[in-house]
């Protein structure tokens, strides 16, 4: 994907080539850094969120040559979600879940997306579906049901629902439907490929 974005940017098809390539390079560096040191780095939840944020930024730069405020705001909401999710993932090898306060980061997308609920019926349904999915995912962290990997894979699939919600808020219903398809496909593939 990074190669395709870089080729499109360098080809000048969409503009913003230099910034898009710089953003793509930063994305590649963040991914490599995360892969190499995420187990040892206490800031790895931030780095993982930064990787996803840079996907939004790079795509925006390739397509339009600029980063609009809604892209940054949506990327920031996604960053917060990824910080919360990655914190949960870092607890995977512990006997019990500690320090629940980082889970508050998972609430940020819901605060940001609140106006989407009132804009359209579809946006409201997506909001409620995403909320229900996150609550269900977090239920795997209860002491009597403790299954941290189960929570993590569900929260990972939930990224697609957040994407769908943000796309609905951007008045892109067909792309929102595609993101919901991504959620379904992710859950199916998680039956074959370990998500953690």
At which residue positions do the language-model features occur?
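Multi-pass alpha-helical transmembrane bundle typical of ion/small-solute transporters
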Residues: 6-8, 19, 23, 32-33, ...
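Short, non-helical or kinked segments that cap or interrupt transmembrane helices
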Residues: 41-43
């Amino acid at each position: 994907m990074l190669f395709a974005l870089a080729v499109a940017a360098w080809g000048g098809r969409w503009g913003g080539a230099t910034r898009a390539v710089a953003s793509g390079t930063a994305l590649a560096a963040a991914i490599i850094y995360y892969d190499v040191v995420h187990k040892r780095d206490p800031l790895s939840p931030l780095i993982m969120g930064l990787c996803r944020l840079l996907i939004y930024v790079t795509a925006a730069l390739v397509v339009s040559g600029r980063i609009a405020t809604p892209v940054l705001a949506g990327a920031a909401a996604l960053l917060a979600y990824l910080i919360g999710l990655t914190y949960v993932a870092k607890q995977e090898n512990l006997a019990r879940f500690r320090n629940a306060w980082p889970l508050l980061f998972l609430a940020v997308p819901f605060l940001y997306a609140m106006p989407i609920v009132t804009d359209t019926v579809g946006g409201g349904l997506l909001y409620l579906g995403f909320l229900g999915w996150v609550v269900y995912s977090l239920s795997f962290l209860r002491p009597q049901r403790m299954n941290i990997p189960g929570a993590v894979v569900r929260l990972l699939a939930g990224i697609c629902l957040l994407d769908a919600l943000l796309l609905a808020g951007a008045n892109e219903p067909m792309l929102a439907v595609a993101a919901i398809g991504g959620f379904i496909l992710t859950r199916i593939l998680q039956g074959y490929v370990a998500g953690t």
